[in-house]
Structure formats: structure tokens, C-alpha cells
Amino acid sequence: MNDQLTAIYTELLLMKEELQSRLFEYSCFQVSTSPQAAINQKQKATLIYHIKEELQDVLLALSKIENGTFGYCEETGAPIPLAKLAVLPTARTANDFLYSVQFEKKTLPIWKSTDIEYGQALYE
């Protein structure tokens, strides 16, 4: 493992530790029946969901480093430069570095048929 990959691996380990501690922190909340508490619980549930998503990405990147498959685009198989991966170590494809893709990924929710309607969710 070269120095650049070792630095990325170390960064991912730190990210994993931080995300696990944040997940534990937000998972330990008390149940209350007040309307304000219900809103706070929804916010915490959303935070927990995003933390779990990030943690899965970090664990996948760590696994790829350990297996020797880190740094290759999952769509094309083309190598991704380590300089780019140093900035975004959880990237899975070359498209992950495009601003527009990242913007849509972080801001637009993915709705399932069981979820509430999009317009309704915006105003709750």
C-alpha cells in the first residue's frame, strides 16, 4: 500500500469511528408524547438514516482497500486517480466527482411507493 492509499485508509478509519459515535449518540434518544418531541424524533430518524448511509459507504471503501479493488469505477471499471479519491474517498464511480451529480444525490430524496407524497413531505 503506497503512502497516498495509506492516508486515505487512515482517513476512512477516522470517518468510520466518527460516524459510529454519531450514530450511537443519535440512537440514544428518549421517547416522548409531545408534538415537539415527535418532530424532533422525525429529525433524528432522518439524521440516523443519513449517518447509516455514510457509514455504509465508508465500510465499502475500507473493504475495497483491503480487497485491492479500491480506486476503480463501478460502472466502467476505469481507474480513478488517487488524488481525486483523497478528496472524496467514498466515491464509487467517476461520476461521483461531478458537482451536479453530488448536488442531486444530496438534495433530492428517493421516494418509495410506501412513502408519503413528495409535496406533502415538503410541508410537514
UniProtKB/Swiss-Prot annotation:
It comes from the Bacteria. A zinc finger (dksA C4-type) spans 73-94. Pfam families: zf-dskA_traR. Disulfide bonds: none annotated. GO terms for molecular function: zinc ion binding. Keywords: Metal-binding, Zinc, Zinc-finger. Coiled coil: none annotated. Gene3D superfamilies: DksA, coiled-coil domain. This is Uncharacterized protein YlyA. It comes from Bacillus subtilis (strain 168). The gene is ylyA.
